[in-house]
């Protein structure tokens, strides 16, 4: 009897300490102006940043993300932003050709084409749209992916995308801290001159680039985090750090939140990020807007399997009514 009571007390003590133990770090605060439902966003950067921005755009927040495709290195990213601000049109000299295909090292392979005229026109349309939206934007979301990048061997020019060209054409380089900061300080000074009210949210992608090993990946991420903090210190009232990198790698710390390659973030990890943003970054009105937008989005995503005409008509009326109410309340045009 005494033996059983002793062990029950030990078990109770163990459970008490287990319950009292802290097994996860707290989610970090976001020291940045709240996201409002009236904001216009412009996203630029890696695939992780693209996924976050797309979540906002799909919720009918006006804006644009990566008009020239995903981009990972901070210097080509600054070059893209500068060209968008300048609205400097593309000319035929901006494009290369390979086996009847035309492309630019400035943009993603998705913008390639077999007609130089069509490719140039597409680039200039994207450029004009991006310029218009950027100058109206209230939030710029930048996501740096890696500090390893590529320069053209002949000119030393940083490229946004190697366009699957032979490796011999490029030099793979690790950008210096001063080079990164000089590019971005100058770029942001220009941005704040043409759009004084814009707020810049900068984050570092938690996606691992492990081609050269974990040590090189960590070296790269450290350089990017250093750059971000330099920019925040230089523009303390206009540039803000969003610690999504720390959320994935320091708070969650679990491969359940990664894809099968153990490098990219999966849908569960992205959902954790969005839940964190809702709690820490969304204004109260934005949170209400988000819930309403999700209802509308779910209606659009809903696939009708019924063949009953009356049921289909009823669902269509419900959707139209909900969309009309949403548009009227939030001044949208869905």
Language model segments and positions:
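Extracellular glycan-modifying ectodomains
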Residues: 12, 17-334
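Short, positively charged and aromatic/hydrophobic N-terminal segments
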Residues: 3-5, 16-17
